Amino acid sequence: MTAYQLEGRNSGVTTADRILDSAQALVQVRGYNGFSYADISAELSITKPSIHHHFPTKAALAEALIARYRERFAVARKEVDDDTAGPRQRLVDYAGLYAQTFADGGRICLCGVFAVDAESLPVAVRHATDAFFADQRRWVAGVLAEAGVPASRVGAAAEAYLAALEGALLLARAHGQPDGAGGGRDVIRSVAETLVDALL
């Protein structure tokens, strides 16, 4: 499967890009409440005022992270649509995005992390997180409908599929093995294929 640019590793040369890359990795491993600007400052050897210049608040940084993640997922979904024949395989390849995320150092979905922290998030960040999941539901529902899932079931089926992928990432982290047979990526792909077969 194609390797998609989701995780922001060395994605740009500007200071803002480097800050976003660092923050994304921190969120995906520690959670929104598990990092501070001091962590980014130490990793990138830049001052905290420099970070505040680009992202005045942690909430502003989080919104920028989610906006970039939404855009990258949109590009990846289009590539799945363009590269893959048939709805079943498109759903399996879409799950590969989640497996790829985990393969990058045991990370989990950026917006899945934000969802876990939802009660402590600023309202704007919660809304941005909701918008990300709305994008995913819309696409998955469209593929399921194309596969012939009845309209009365499409919404619930899309929710179930997304919930399974997000949960599979947590199980993969519990396994603690990004690579190798039986490791995290295999867990994610197995969950996806099993659920796709059940839904279609």
What does each model-found stretch correspond to?
Residues 18, 22-60, 64:
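Helix-turn-helix
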Residues 80, 97-102, 110-120, 143-146:
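Helix-loop "lid/cap" segments that line or gate small-molecule binding pockets
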Residues 1-14:
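N-terminal intrinsically disordered/low-complexity leader segments
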